[in-house]
């Protein structure tokens, strides 16, 4: 994968999060193979994730403040407005938690989330996140490439797509008591999209364990697609031969296609995609093709009509 030449900006210079400036010193002390010994039985939201290493995946963009990232959320399982999830997601219990990896794989497995956390070295990736509603943020995610998990379960030749299924628990996810969507939430990627080095399996942000409202304890992040493609609070990962029908496509097929690549030239029926409002900014900015990751991912869609396959 080609790396961008974006200037490196120290996290301490671009974020107001008070505790964030200590992370570099912490990581240096905990890096490498010795990090495994630092893991407690489990970690709760707000605790530091040990052994997180930095990579070249940084941006010139300023980070969105932690308070905005944690309190401006689309997570319909906890409510349909942006502020409710941060107030109601405390009811979600993220331990014990398992993720079943199944379907067209040679080595299906039921992972305890704490074992999944230690499957590969954790790294920080600063990514843009673009919502189809026309707003965006910049988030320092913590996780590892989803490809690390995929390689270990060895997909068969029949595996063409990867489906992600969110927990269904109306008692703890009160939004699931409504009929606004067909629960549980489902999303999917082509196998090559899931294997792409930019696609992350995520366990934290800002160096800390994911807040519940941001998809704890494990989610995916696909930075060149609209945010609804990045499934949260995952309990099943299925490898299948036929293209799955995702939740939003099932709900409104004329508005939500399978691919959902960020594309300023293809508007949603309700929202222009030409510009976006970055949280914390007053003026809108032009939206970048593939959310600014065209150099890395455009080849995945060579020859495709992106207006037809939206």
UniProtKB/Swiss-Prot annotation:
Disulphide bonds in the chain: none
Gene Ontology terms describing biological process: protein repair
Known cofactor(s): Mo-molybdopterin
Binding site for Mo-molybdopterin: 73, 76-77, 131, 166, 214, 219, 230-232
Gene3D superfamilies according to UniProt: Oxidoreductase, molybdopterin-binding domain
Signal peptide positions on this chain: 1-45
CC terms in the record's Gene Ontology section: periplasmic space
Keyword Oxidoreductase tagged: yes
Location in or out of the cell: Periplasm
Catalysis performed (reactions): L-methionyl-[protein] + a quinone + H2O = L-methionyl-(S)-S-oxide-[protein] + a quinol; L-methionyl-[protein] + a quinone + H2O = L-methionyl-(R)-S-oxide-[protein] + a quinol
Gene Ontology MF terms: metal ion binding; molybdopterin cofactor binding; oxidoreductase activity, acting on a sulfur group of donors, quinone or similar compound as acceptor
This enzyme's EC code(s): 1.8.5.-
Main localization category: periplasm
Keyword terms: Metal-binding, Molybdenum, Oxidoreductase, Periplasm, Signal
The organism's place on the tree of life at top rank: Bacteria
PANTHER family assigned to the protein according to its UniProt record, in alphabetical order: PROTEIN-METHIONINE-SULFOXIDE REDUCTASE, PROTEIN-METHIONINE-SULFOXIDE REDUCTASE CATALYTIC SUBUNIT MSRP
Entry function: Part of the MsrPQ system that repairs oxidized periplasmic proteins containing methionine sulfoxide residues (Met-O), using respiratory chain electrons. Thus protects these proteins from oxidative-stress damage caused by reactive species of oxygen and chlorine generated by the host defense mechanisms. MsrPQ is essential for the maintenance of envelope integrity under bleach stress, rescuing a wide series of structurally unrelated periplasmic proteins from methionine oxidation.
UniProt subunit comment: Heterodimer of a catalytic subunit (MsrP) and a heme-binding subunit (MsrQ).
Family per similarity comment: Belongs to the MsrP family.
Protein name: Protein-methionine-sulfoxide reductase catalytic subunit MsrP
């Amino acid at each position: 994968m080609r790396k961008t030449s974006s200037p490196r900006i120290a996290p301490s210079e671009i974020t107001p999060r008070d505790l964030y400036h200590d992370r570099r010193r912490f990581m240096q002390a905990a890096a490498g193979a010795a990090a495994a010994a630092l893991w407690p039985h489990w970690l709760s939201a707000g605790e530091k994730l040990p052994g997180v290493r930095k990579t070249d995946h940084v941006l010139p963009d300023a980070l969105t403040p932690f308070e905005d990232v944690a309190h401006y959320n689309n997570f319909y399982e906890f409510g349909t407005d942006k502020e409710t999830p941060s107030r109601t997601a405390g009811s979600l219990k993220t331990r014990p938690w398992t993720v079943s990896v199944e379907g067209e794989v040679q080595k299906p497995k039921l992972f305890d989330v704490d074992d999944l956390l230690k499957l590969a070295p954790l790294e920080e990736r600063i990514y843009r996140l673009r919502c189809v509603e026309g707003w965006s943020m910049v988030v320092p995610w913590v996780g590892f490439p989803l490809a690390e998990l995929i390689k270990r379960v060895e997909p068969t030749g029949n595996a063409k797509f990867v489906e992600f299924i969110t927990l269904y628990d109306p008692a703890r996810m009160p939004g699931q008591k409504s009929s606004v969507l067909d629960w549980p939430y489902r999303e999917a990627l082509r196998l090559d999209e899931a294997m792409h080095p930019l696609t992350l399996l995520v366990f934290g942000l800002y160096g800390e364990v994911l807040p519940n409202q941001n998809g704890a304890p494990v989610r995916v992040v696909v930075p060149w697609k609209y945010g609804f493609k990045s499934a949260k609070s995952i309990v099943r990962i299925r490898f299948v031969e036929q293209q799955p029908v995702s939740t939003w496509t099932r709900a409104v097929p004329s508005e939500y296609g399978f691919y959902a690549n960020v594309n300023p030239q293809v508007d949603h029926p309700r929202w222009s995609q030409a510009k976006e409002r970055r949280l914390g900014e007053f003026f809108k900015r032009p939206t970048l093709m593939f959310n600014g990751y065209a150099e890395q991912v455009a080849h995945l869609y060579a020859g495709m009509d992106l207006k037809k396959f939206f």
